[in-house]
Design a protein with these regions (language model features):
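Regulatory and interdomain segments flanking nucleotide-handling catalytic cores
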Residues: 1-228
């Protein structure tokens, strides 16, 4: 059966203060726990080496939304302004770099934290190559990537993620939080109450963050046939 994995790495994690990284790690762990609970254990993930994340998704159609949830979760965590420190500015803009892999899996062992197969090969290799490409750079071309055994589909989805990468790079903390909650399925009036702001403000930030494009991309991905 076709499954999906997400391999991810916090951008410029060494530039974060100890208390900032600790808080971010706790937010990511909470997100991973929620992911597992909502799927009754079918989906799961782990945070390792302090700044790396791996996620297994039983249903590959959930990968795009989950990746964007992880992206906006990290981006919404700290409400910084523009940073003079180059590495902290990279974190503010990008938050986390990630790669989605879709394919057959040979081994999925939650207890031993072991993943082996096509999906993790694609996501892991893409992320590793991007890390090498980004090393020493003060700017990044890509922080969201996609791979599967269908070259045409890979190119199509990868292009879509590249465009959303540009959109989300510009998103502020509050805009990222609104997109995050919309990805969870919450309505604007619910988000307004949650954030203690007015509904028109939610709508304005949502439009500024490119929500319509994000939603369209997610819905398109969720309709794909990965078994053919």
């Amino acid at each position: 059966m076709v499954r999906a994995t997400i391999s991810a790495d916090i951008v410029s994690s060494t530039a974060l203060k100890v208390e900032e990284l600790t808080f971010l790690q706790s937010e990511i762990r909470r997100f991973l726990e929620s992911l597992s609970e909502k799927s009754q254990g079918k989906n799961w993930g782990r945070l390792f080496k302090g700044d790396s994340v791996e996620i297994f998704l039983h249903d590959p159609h959930e990968a795009f939304r989950t990746a964007l949830l992880l992206k906006t979760l990290v981006k919404k965590t700290f409400s910084w302004g523009k940073e003079t420190n180059a590495k902290r500015e990279l974190f503010r803009k990008y938050g986390i770099r990630l790669a989605i892999g879709v394919g057959e899996m040979r081994t999925v062992d939650k207890k031993q934290d072991v993943l082996d197969g096509e999906a993790i090969y694609y996501s892991g290799r893409l992320l590793e190559n991007q890390l090498k490409s980004d090393k020493g750079r003060t700017s990044m071309k890509r922080t969201m990537l996609f791979g599967c055994n269908d070259e045409s589909l890979s190119e199509q989805i990868d292009t879509m993620l590249g465009l959303l990468d540009v959109v989300l790079k510009k998103a502020t903390s509050i805009q990222s939080e609104i997109v995050y909650n919309k990805l969870l399925g919450k309505q604007e009036n619910e988000i307004a109450k949650l954030l203690n702001i007015k509904q028109p403000t939610v709508n304005r930030h949502s439009n500024s963050a490119g929500w319509n494009a994000i939603e369209s991309a997610v819905k398109y991905f969720e309709k794909l046939n990965f078994e053919s």
